């Protein structure tokens, strides 16, 4: 299992963005980006399945901006369900992407999965962040959609997930 990753993406942060980033403690980063033809594969892991899902959501948002520049000014909740763990992960990420792209332009600094009901495949989560603003947050690459292509959920001793996102 990989260790916590250091964010090496260069966003050419302004002094104001660096100041916001320094204002809050860094959020644990247990994810990486894997090369994939024309898309990006997210690989996230955690001590629990909940943490692996959280990290996958943060990997998705981390591809769109430096989440360290986001201030936890608002709270957004997402509840979703699926037919199995893969569809639950898909709908979880899709709902968070909707909060960003179509609904509130909400970008989280942190996402926390409050519970996963693995019997009925339901999930409750919460995120702390703010409305995305180009004047405040560096622009990464837009995530257009979540895909089922090569999606994997390993719910074992060291849970990990793999998801391809369409960019």
From Swiss-Prot:
Gene3D superfamilies: Archease domain. Pfam families: Archease (PF01951). Ca(2+) binds at residues 39, 166-167. The modification N-acetylalanine is found at residue 2. The keyword tRNA processing applies. Keywords: Acetylation, Calcium, Metal-binding, tRNA processing. GO terms for cellular component: cytoplasm; nucleoplasm; nucleus; tRNA-splicing ligase complex. One of its GO terms (biological process) is tRNA splicing, via endonucleolytic cleavage and ligation. It comes from the Eukaryota. Changing residue 39 to A: Abolishes ability to activate tRNA ligase activity of RTCB. GO terms for molecular function: metal ion binding. The keyword Metal-binding applies. Component of the tRNA-splicing ligase complex. Belongs to the archease family. PANTHER family: ARCHEASE, PROTEIN ARCHEASE. Component of the tRNA-splicing ligase complex required to facilitate the enzymatic turnover of catalytic subunit RTCB. Together with DDX1, acts by facilitating the guanylylation of RTCB, a key intermediate step in tRNA ligation. This is Protein archease. It comes from Homo sapiens (Human). The lineage of its organism: Eukaryota, Metazoa, Chordata, Craniata, Vertebrata. The gene is ZBTB8OS.
């Amino acid at each position: 299992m990989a260790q916590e990753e250091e964010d090496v993406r260069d966003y050419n942060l302004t002094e104001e963005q660096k100041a916001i980033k320094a204002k809050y403690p860094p959020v644990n980063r247990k994810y990486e980006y894997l090369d994939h033809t024309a898309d990006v594969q997210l690989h996230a892991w955690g001590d629990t399945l909940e943490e692996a899902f959280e990290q996958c959501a943060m990997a998705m948002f981390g591809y769109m901006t430096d989440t360290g520049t986001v201030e936890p000014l608002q709270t957004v909740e997402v509840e979703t369900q699926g037919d199995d763990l893969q569809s639950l992960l898909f709908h979880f990420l899709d709902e968070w992407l909707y909060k960003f792209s179509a609904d509130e332009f909400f970008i989280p600094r942190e996402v926390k999965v409050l519970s996963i009901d693995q019997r009925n495949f339901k999930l409750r989560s919460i995120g702390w962040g703010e409305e995305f603003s180009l004047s405040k947050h560096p622009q990464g690459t837009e995530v257009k959609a979540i895909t089922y292509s090569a999606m994997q959920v390993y719910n074992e001793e060291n849970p990990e997930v793999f998801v391809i996102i369409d960019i």
